[in-house]
């Protein structure tokens, strides 16, 4: 597989498996349960919780890409000075810092704030995309070294790619957002 090589992957086939209701009668304290019509809503709540987890993974890729970029830019010299002292590099690093900090605020608000119907898909979409762009920027900052397997930024980019797929690719998230807007 392309990335997340430290995570085991396998195909599972369930044959003659039993299914269980998400909430048996009265389990959630509201008297609801089998036949209460909230099965899909409960499943979407679980999916949105998982989407926030994927958003955290995208944020983690972005933050690691930022840290690797900052360390490299401080250590690497070009044209008589460390990369971090060149104005265009300062701008790129500053933009990356702003994007990572903004995504972190979104992800943390998603966990701590009220659960908005649109929150989880939007946060996941933004953070997962940022993981890829930050890793790509890190490769650019590292120059030719960024393309070499021995440097961590190549792995970060490979690992970040899957976050846009897990728990709903971009087009599904956009459909969820559109449906929620139409309902509201």
Segments from the language model and where they lie:
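Internal glycine-rich alpha/beta core junctions
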Residues: 1-184
